[in-house]
Amino acid sequence: MAPERRSRLSDAGILVSLLALTSLVPVQAAVTTSKPDYAKRAERVLRSTPLIDGHNDLPFAIRRSTHDQIYDGKVPFETALKGQTDLPRMRKGRMGGQFWSVYVGCPSDPNTPIDFPTFATRDTLEQIDVARRLVDKYSKDLMYCDNPACAKKAFREGKIGSFIGIEGGHQVGSSIAALRQAFYAGARYMTLTHNCDNAWATAASTVRAGKPDLGMTEFGPALIKEMNRLGMLVDLSHVSHQTMRDVLKVTKAPVIFSHSSAYAVSKHLRNVPDDVLKTVAKNNGVVMVTFVRSFVNIDNPDSVTVDDIVKHIFHIAEVAGWDHVGLGGDYDGTTELPKGLEDVSKYPYLIEKVLEHGATEEQARKLIGENILRVWTEVEKIGKRIQNSGALPVEEVWQGRNWTQSLTKRSTFIPTESPTQLEFGCD
């Protein structure tokens, strides 16, 4: 009887073991099926917060292709354009706001004097005009905004907020007065330089060409003072590293980088070094990551994918914090775009990747729009506070500027000593 008893006990043990094993199967299946749905999470983020891109060159693309003519079917924005941006793709990309860049190139000769005769200011105003006319034409989908409250309103109404930025100080002739008029015309940020120096600052391209990084000029602080007074965003993309540092020492308001990435990840001078990222955090500013392949990976640009963009985003978030990173693709300003981010319709995929790499939904909301809206709101508040204090517009002019021949010698029309001695000089 004893052997039979042992056999029954063994059978019972096997049965218990089998039951235990089978009980694990549903648990394992549950683990497998609970994989996060990043697309659904990205959709939740995009539904709650406007995705605002810091830099898109569509106005320049229009200028180049149609000389600013948008009517009579010349620019079929509502159906399909050949570039990287049009209304259907913006909608597919779940875009909530766009800073439209108005861009006029620097002189082709790098030795051109700063105060060169130019039509750049005229051309800039014409691009502001075409950007605003495009928004008006498609007002069912786009809303022109010159303040962050309007940007939020546009999103609530299901429209794409449309804002304007100037891509280079040479476009206002190195003139604070001209900059002020561009602000009144609707521009809400100005990039201090493009790929040329001006009366205010040194450009990154100058340093790349082997010349010294002189940073901001003596005239530069006057510009920053006026931009702070106006409530205009100071954009430090394109400037040299020393210019970044110099501006951050004098500005009273947060700054933006409308389309730059992390220098520690890719040693391109258009990117932002870590010491500057830390200062941007103290300044409460934002660095909006660009997608230009040669900036993202200077050593192997052809290999760049969406994962490389995510790497820049996470580096900036690690050094400066999630409150200080945003997005500035540079669509229609480059042909160098990563696999997976070929046009503006691909933004949801980027947000999925950011979440997949470990960002929370709260962090993703900051990235796509909350940060730039916070910065813009603070810049606007600081401007109003400065104006309410009685601060007058800055009148300072660059000492190296050329005056027309009739103005090279000051008239005594405004008397400094004797009110009886007036010289009109225009008879």
Curated annotation (Swiss-Prot):
Keyword tags: Dipeptidase, Disulfide bond, Glycoprotein, Hydrolase, Metal-binding, Metalloprotease, Protease, Signal, Zinc
Single GO MF annotation: metal ion binding
Source organism, top-level taxon: Eukaryota
Name of a matching Pfam family: Peptidase_M19
List of residues binding Zn(2+) 2: E167, H238, H259
Main enzyme class: hydrolase
Classification via CDD domains: rDP_like
Intrachain disulfide bonds: C106-C196
Cofactor: Zn(2+)
Reactions that this protein is recorded to catalyse: an L-aminoacyl-L-amino acid + H2O = 2 an L-alpha-amino acid
Family: Belongs to the metallo-dependent hydrolases superfamily. Peptidase M19 family.
The protein's role, per its UniProt record: Hydrolyzes a wide range of dipeptides.
Protein name listed in UniProt: Putative dipeptidase MCYG_02918
Lineage: Eukaryota, Fungi, Dikarya, Ascomycota, Pezizomycotina
